[in-house]
């Protein structure tokens, strides 16, 4: 996660989802995988949600809090009045590879009392780089009674159904998790060069170890998302 992305439509989507999951009875922990500095890309520019009623209806408290951000930064997000009570954060910048193991242990300690831990790496799950979370870090964070959620950005290397199956199978092997589901979302946003045209932004949110109540909350959230224009959502992996 970089400061330049704070408050983008992807934040509205993921924070609304996390708030829906946490409700009033789960403690939320956020592992930002924070990368200081601007990478020069145009990602994070989509703020059209501020003027779209449907996003406000989805979660009015979140909409108000994000729209009032005094600056676009991860620190400002943490201070915003958008989080469930007692939410926890780990914002220590991503270290060089040699320091990653110790960094991961500090992250686990910072989020120890969280019932739901969300991993927010820039490019999803992958190798041990500053843009990825790793399978070993998921293993380190797992414990009884906790669900882990992470964001994935599906590529075009294969059909998405096959890619999802591959992801779930790899997670089962690498983390020993038996219960894995994914919320697949697709949000169409204005194209930079053609404002009246739209491009698709696909974000997947994968759960490890969700209980029945969290699955029910995820299902309800997916249904609510379909009421927003140019947004699609489907929940996969439910037995």
Residue ranges and their predicted role:
Residues 1-239:
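Class I S-adenosyl-L-methionine-dependent methyltransferase catalytic core
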């Amino acid at each position: 996660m970089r400061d330049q992305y704070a408050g983008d439509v992807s934040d509205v989507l993921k924070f609304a989802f996390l708030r829906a999951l946490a409700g009033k009875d789960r403690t939320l922990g956020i592992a930002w995988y924070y990368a200081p500095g601007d990478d020069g890309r145009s990602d994070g520019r989509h703020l059209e949600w501020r003027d779209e009623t449907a996003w406000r209806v989805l979660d009015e408290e979140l909409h108000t809090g994000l729209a009032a951000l005094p600056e676009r930064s991860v620190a400002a997000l943490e201070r915003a009045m958008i989080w469930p009570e007692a939410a926890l954060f780990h914002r220590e910048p991503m270290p060089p590879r040699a320091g990653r193991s110790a960094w991961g242990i500090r992250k686990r300690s910072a989020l120890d009392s969280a019932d739901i831990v969300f991993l927010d790496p820039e490019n999803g799950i992958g190798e041990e780089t500053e843009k990825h979370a790793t399978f070993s870090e998921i293993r380190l964070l797992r414990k009884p009674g906790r669900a882990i959620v992470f964001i994935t950005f599906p590529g075009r290397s294969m059909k998405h159904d096959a890619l999802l199956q591959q992801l779930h199978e790899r997670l089962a092997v690498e983390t020993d998790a038996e219960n894995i589901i994914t919320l697949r979302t697709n949000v169409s946003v204005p194209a930079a060069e053609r404002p009246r045209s739209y491009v698709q932004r696909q974000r997947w949110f994968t759960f490890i170890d969700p209980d029945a109540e969290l699955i029910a909350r995820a299902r309800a959230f997916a249904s609510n998302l379909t009421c927003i224009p140019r947004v699609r959502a489907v929940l996969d992996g439910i037995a």
